[in-house]
Design a protein with these regions (language model features):
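Conserved beta-strand-loop-beta-strand hairpin that lines the nucleotide-binding pocket
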Residues: 1-14, 59-139
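A generic secondary-structure signal
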Residues: 3, 33-37, 57
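STAS-typified acidic loop motif
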Residues: 14-26
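Short coil/turn residues that cap or connect secondary-structure elements
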Residues: 19, 35, 39-42, 62, ...
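Short, structured helix-loop boundary elements
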Residues: 21-24, 44, 110
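Histidine-centered phosphotransfer motif of kinases
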Residues: 46-64
Length: 139
């Protein structure tokens, strides 16, 4: 997915949140409620889980002391059959999708994002990065 496709799409929500653990809950709730209000409830749960994982990664890996901000954008990507979740933060280091042992308690976030989305990726943005995931919906 090209960055321009996301920018040209109708934005459903745009949030600026503090880099603290409580932002995970706020972002997840907004995404779920927004998709429900726009008649896209069938993907609301998956989008909320993806949002939780991406925001949690931003809080844990990019925000350190909580001073940084996290951006969350939800768009109807170019056609009615897709929705894109984008989470941006101030850390330029790209996400590290790693294999986690079966008994591991952490490190599965990007595996979950990959499993629930059509595709995902990231780009550099304003000294940080943006991580996106595209969800397909039945229309």
């Amino acid at each position: 997915m090209a960055r321009t496709a996301t920018q040209a799409s109708p934005r459903l929500i745009a949030l600026a949140l503090p880099g603290i653990p409580g932002s995970v809950t706020v972002a997840r709730r907004h995404v779920r409620e927004t998709l429900g209000l726009h008649g896209m409830g069938e993907i609301a749960q998956d989008a909320a889980i993806i949002t939780s994982e991406l925001v949690a990664n931003a809080v844990q890996h990019a925000c350190g002391n909580g001073a940084a901000r996290i951006g969350v954008t939800l768009t109807a990507a170019g056609n009615p059959a897709a929705v894109t979740v984008v989470v941006s933060d101030s850390c330029p280091q790209g996400p590290d999708r790693r294999e986690t042992p079966a008994d591991g308690e952490q490190g599965r976030g990007l595996q979950i994002v990959e499993a629930l989305s059509v595709h995902w990726g990231w780009w550099y943005e304003d000294g940080g990065k943006a991580v996106f995931a595209v969800l397909a919906r039945e229309v």
